């Protein structure tokens, strides 16, 4: 009898554990129809996923011959970062092409006819419809042959993807010659100087890295000369900034780096992506974060939090006052503005303890999705 109860208890605990793991690690296989062809992808929902949050989406494409599961497990695992930074990670699956390769198809003279552009377009629509994802914050990255595909997406889907990231791949010459993006797009590129697959200085098929950077700087109408920052470990970051909408071109050069997915790639890519919407970014002098940079409680935008901010909030509420950032007035971050917000600010000022919801005390973007306007704010 004791053994029976023990087994029952063990089963109950296992069920609880399984439920907890299912809630914290939601990997969902999905399919989508692309012109009569069934395409597969896997969706990772971050912990405590709520469709009301309208999260951004990062599509991650592996190298040639790799399944999405392999890329997720052994190279581009974005799941911990998705939990921490609140985004949905998607791992698309390539099709077996006419040459027997589980490879992504690139547009151009060597195309196998597989519609990868339509695949991305269909996945974006599905993520918006099925998970209420934010259509303004769709991002894609790829490694090796998956990285080569990103150049097609940058050229063909700049009005769908806010930014793309490319690791260990340069543009094919034919991709550049046919590239006419509908609008500027954020570009972040990671490449080693000893990469055998994507030669840093180009070859008969791919363009040199400096030519590629100049091309995208021209597309984004940035400054012609980049800033240069050492990242340590032989890595140097070059950034072309100050284009319209602050669309940036960023290039990480890895001195003596080979054809690999570097360990810093996930964080570097997301740091870049997280600034973007389709309309712009927050990188470079004079640029504000894409969702509107502000400091919660700093209602008058003077860079500090004091009694005048509470007064400004009350004037806004009851006397027709104007503010440049409604999100800054939302002191309790509940997505609405009322007397409770002024009370929250006053409580922080005079209680001597506690804090306000982020972004606070530093300036930043609002991680809470709401209808409050803060896009034209210049307070920080």
Where are the model-predicted features located?
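Acidic catalytic loop of the alpha/beta-hydrolase fold
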Residues: 194-198, 259-260
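Short beta-strand/loop motif that positions the catalytic acidic residue
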Residues: 189-191
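A domain-start/cap signature at the N-terminus of enzymes
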Residues: 21-57, 88, 138-171, 175, ...
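Catalytic active-site module of serine/aspartate enzymes centered on a nucleophile-bearing elbow/loop
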Residues: 265-282
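Sec-dependent N-terminal signal peptides
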Residues: 4-16
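Serine-hydrolase catalytic machinery in alpha/beta-hydrolase-like enzymes
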Residues: 27-48, 52-139, 148, 152, ...
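Cellulosome-associated attachment modules in secreted, modular CAZymes
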Residues: 282-380
């Amino acid at each position: 009898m004791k053994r029976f109860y023990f087994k029952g208890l063990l089963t109950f605990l296992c069920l609880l554990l399984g439920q907890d793991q299912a809630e914290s690690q939601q990997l969902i296989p999905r399919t989508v129809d692309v012109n009569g062809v069934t395409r597969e992808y896997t969706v990772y929902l971050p912990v405590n996923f709520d469709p009301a949050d309208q999260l951004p989406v990062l599509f991650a494409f592996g190298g040639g011959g790799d399944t999405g599961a392999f890329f997720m497990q052994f190279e581009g695992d974005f799941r911990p970062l998705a939990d921490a930074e609140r985004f949905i990670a998607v791992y698309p699956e390539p099709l077996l092409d006419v040459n027997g390769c589980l490879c992504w198809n690139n547009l151009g003279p060597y195309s196998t006819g597989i519609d990868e552009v339509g695949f991305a377009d269909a996945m974006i629509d599905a993520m918006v419809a099925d998970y209420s994802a934010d259509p303004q914050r769709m991002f894609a990255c790829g490694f090796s042959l998956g990285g080569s595909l990103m150049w097609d997406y940058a050229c063909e889907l700049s009005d769908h993807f806010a930014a793309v990231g490319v690791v260990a791949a340069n543009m094919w010459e034919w991709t550049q010659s046919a590239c006419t993006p509908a609008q500027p797009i954020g570009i972040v590129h990671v490449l080693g100087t000893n990469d055998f697959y994507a030669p840093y200085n180009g070859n008969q098929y791919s363009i040199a890295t400096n030519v590629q950077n100049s091309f995208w700087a021209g597309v984004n109408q940035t400054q012609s000369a980049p800033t240069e920052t050492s990242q340590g470990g032989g890595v140097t970051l070059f950034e072309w900034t100050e284009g319209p909408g602050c669309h940036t071109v960023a290039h990480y050069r890895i001195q003596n780096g080979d054809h690999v997915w570097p360990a810093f790639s996930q964080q570097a890519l997301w740091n870049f992506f997280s600034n973007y919407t389709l309309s712009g970014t927050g990188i470079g002098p004079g640029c504000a974060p894409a969702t509107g940079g502000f400091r919660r409680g700093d209602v008058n935008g003077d860079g500090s939090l004091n009694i005048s901010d509470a007064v400004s909030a009350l004037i806004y509420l009851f006397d027709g006052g104007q503010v440049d950032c409604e999100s800054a007035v939302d002191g309790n971050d509940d997505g609405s503005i009322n007397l409770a917000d002024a009370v929250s600010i006053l409580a922080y000022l005079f209680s001597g303890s506690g804090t306000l919801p982020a972004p606070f005390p530093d300036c930043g973007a609002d991680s809470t999705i709401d209808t409050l306007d803060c896009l034209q704010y210049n307070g920080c």
